[in-house]
Amino acid sequence: MKVLVVVQARTGSTRLPGKVLLPVAGAPLLVRMLERVRAASTPTEVVVATTTDAGDQPVRDLARQAGVRCFSGHPTDLLDRHYQAALACGLSPAPASGGGDGDEGDGDVVVKIPSDCPLIDPAVIDRVIGCYLAAPERYDFVSNLHPATYPDGNDVEAMPMAVLAAAWREATRPHEREHTTPFIWDQPERFRLGNVPWETGRDLSMSHRFTVDYPEDYAFVSAVFDALWTGDGTAPSGGFGLNEILDLLAARPDIFELNRRYAGVNWYRNHLGELATVGADQTRRPEEAR
């Protein structure tokens, strides 16, 4: 069994162009993100999945400098990009046991983590992947997003390569291609879904925002790194995780306020009429955020 973490990254963000290249604690945001992904204890291979656009050459260069494999694929069809990246890394789309949906066994595993989550806690990555690996015969998809409870920006989705292949073959609606996995998690009657809630019992998914889409998000992430990053090379994750971030925000409400107005803003808002398992209480529009 291979476990492949696919980190999607590009420079063409409309709200914050080139965000993965912006400096965070003396290195590009993507580098800090990859450090935290690789700090997870679960043995995985990591690949950066960028686009074929010439403007994404800096992403390819950064991945190479970081010692991480890079795949260049479709600019807007993220489902195809993830699938092709996994194929390029040697994963097999065939179910391990030769079955179909619901019988993927211990085949190769794809883990989806977006590159705009530079504060992701390596322990959260381990929890989600560990949930799947503990009983791969039970699940077609495991994430910590359905429903979400962790602060936004700790997104981890794990699935057998065979299930990703089924989505790649069958998904036709634009949002299913753009966002990679809705074809899977929006069909609980077909796919066996697992969710990993925050073990604290808290739900900060709509109140705390650790992802980067807007300039205010970048200011927030920069402030967190400036306050907590050790920079001494002894801790691959920078020496801090989710608990340390929350302690910092409790002590420094000025940092928390930097991007609070965008808490709860996500892509669901544009597809509420198309998503069967997502409600209006799981998203906000930017103009509604305060």
Regions found by a protein language model. Name each.
Residues 2-50:
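N-terminal glycine-rich phosphate-binding loop and ensuing alpha1 helix
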Residues 75-76, 117-119:
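Acidic metal-phosphate-binding loop of nucleotide-sugar-dependent transferases
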Residues 110:
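Short aromatic/hydrophobic "clamp" motif used to bind/position activated sugar donors
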Residues 156-168, 215-219:
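Conserved nucleotide-sugar donor-binding
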Residues 31-98, 105-107:
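Conserved N-terminal catalytic core of the sugar/cofactor nucleotidyltransferase
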Residues 84, 89-91, 121-149:
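Conserved donor-nucleotide/metal-binding helix-loop-beta segment in metal-dependent transferases, i.e.
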Residues 181-290:
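Conserved alpha/beta core of the MobA/IspD/sugar-nucleotide pyrophosphorylase nucleotidyltransferase superfamily
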Residues 113-115:
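Active-site acidic Asp-centered loop
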